């Protein structure tokens, strides 16, 4: 089982599908950074309106998952594809090529399915979360970071983990990444079940 899992993990993280998914996510993240974050970072007062209850642009309201705009909307719509493309269809292709029969003669079916399930889950989660992590790191590098004010972020006081967001935003972001990783991984494994 361990050797099979090692082989499947190596196949999964070297697959062209994972590279394509990561590339698509990183392109969306880079577009967001260069179209929204960088212009604001170069001239932070240009977007600031006096007389309103607004804060200066910061990480909390500028990075892709918390800001407004088409970038995150497109990214969220593509997450099911980004999660499934990397490695989920390999069971079907292995079955068509006859590799599955080779594995079944050497080990139990549950061992092979488990060794296939774990890489599918991990690649799906990685493809969904890595571009957001890169966007947060890039945004944090050029924008000021301070605790969010309730009306400047899409999460209100009744939202999930809002008490953490308004006291420790980076812990909130870490929890958000973990939740998204798990959801994307489960989404990717659903396609494994179908195949």
Name every feature range the model reports, one short phrase each:
Residues 1-25:
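Aromatic- and glycine-rich beta-strand/loop motifs that create alpha-glucan
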Residues 1-9, 110, 114, 167-174:
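Alpha-helical membrane-protein architecture signal
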Residues 11, 102-103, 114, 192-195:
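Conserved catalytic-core segments centered on acid/base and nucleophilic motifs
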Residues 25-85, 118-188, 192:
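Secretory targeting signals
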Residues 90-122:
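Helix-loop-helix units of permease transmembrane domains in multi-pass membrane transporters
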């Amino acid at each position: 089982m361990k050797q099979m899992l090692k082989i499947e993990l190596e196949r999964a993280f070297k697959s062209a599908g994972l590279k394509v998914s990561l590339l698509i996510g990183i392109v969306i993240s880079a577009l967001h950074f260069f179209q929204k974050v960088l212009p604001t970072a170069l001239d932070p007062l240009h977007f600031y309106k006096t007389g309103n209850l607004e804060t200066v642009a910061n990480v909390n309201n500028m990075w892709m998952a918390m800001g407004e705009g088409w970038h995150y909307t497109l990214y969220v719509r593509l997450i099911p594809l980004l999660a499934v493309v990397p490695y989920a269809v390999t069971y079907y292709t292995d079955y068509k090529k006859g590799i599955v029969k080779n594995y079944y003669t050497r080990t139990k079916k549950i061992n092979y399915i488990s060794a296939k399930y774990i890489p599918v889950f991990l690649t799906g989660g990685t493809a969904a979360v890595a571009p957001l992590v890169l966007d947060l790191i890039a945004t944090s590098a050029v924008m000021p970071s301070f605790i969010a004010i309730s009306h400047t972020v899409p999460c209100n006081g009744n939202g999930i983990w809002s008490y953490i967001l308004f006291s420790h935003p980076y812990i909130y972001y870490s929890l958000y990444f973990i939740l998204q990783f798990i959801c994307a991984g489960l989404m990717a494994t659903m396609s494994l079940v179908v195949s």
